[in-house]
Amino acid sequence: SSPRKGGIRLMEALLETKIFKVSVERLLLNGGQTLYMVGIALLIGTVIGTLLALVLVLCRKGGLVENKVLHSIVSLYINVVRSVPFIILLVTIMPLTRAILGTTIGSTAALVPLVVYISPYLARLIENSLLEVSPGILEAAQAMGATTWQIIRCFLMPEALGSMVLALTTGTVGLLGASAMAGYCGGGGIGDLALTYGYEKMNTPLMIVTVIVLVILVQLLQMAGNRVSRRLREHR
């Protein structure tokens, strides 16, 4: 129908509109790639990071299931990965990325190094959150005959949730920066936009806008994280 065709043409015209010499379609595509990388990597990284943090807390000296060997292995792994700059980690594990996904280029391929990078980072942050829980609460749970799983699910995690939200907020900010670096190696996203269409083409206004967008995203994330954490602490 004519109205429908007119709407399609209008949408195409809007997508082809250029802002700082870059089409709106390209801006939306790269922005979506960043959200995709950060969202998926954060989800997987949070699960792995939480499991690693629980191992560190439960298996430490005096923990609920003390295991010095397992604690030392996990702690060493976390320290080693965290000590490697992300850009070096990105290049180093390219063979692993290729083995898993068959390619090292694209937003999906960037998920592998991003998850490897963020998991140990979140593990340390979540470990600190879990260690903030009063030992008296755990001792009371043990005295009531609660199992290790019940202590984790009903006492440890709920008490640490407010602090964990702040930890995840910090991790998300770090992940946002890492995703921008991933763009340098073909990961796409805002970083790729700034480098390919900004730096390499001497498009300074686009680079400035990219930085401003990243700053705004970080501020919004931090504000949201602080607010959620405060509410969780109040209703604990």
What are these regions (language model features)?
Residues 29-37, 82, 86-119, 206-210:
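Loop-to-helix entry region at the N-terminal start of transmembrane alpha-helices
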Residues 27-58, 168:
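Transmembrane alpha-helix signature in integral membrane proteins
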Residues 55-61, 207-236:
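C-terminal transmembrane helix and the adjacent membrane-cytosol boundary/short C-terminal tail
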Residues 55-92, 114, 119, 124-128:
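Cytoplasmic-entry segments and transmembrane alpha-helices of multi-pass inner-membrane transporters
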Residues 10-41, 67-72:
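Periplasmic/extracellular loop-to-transmembrane helix junction in inner-membrane transport proteins
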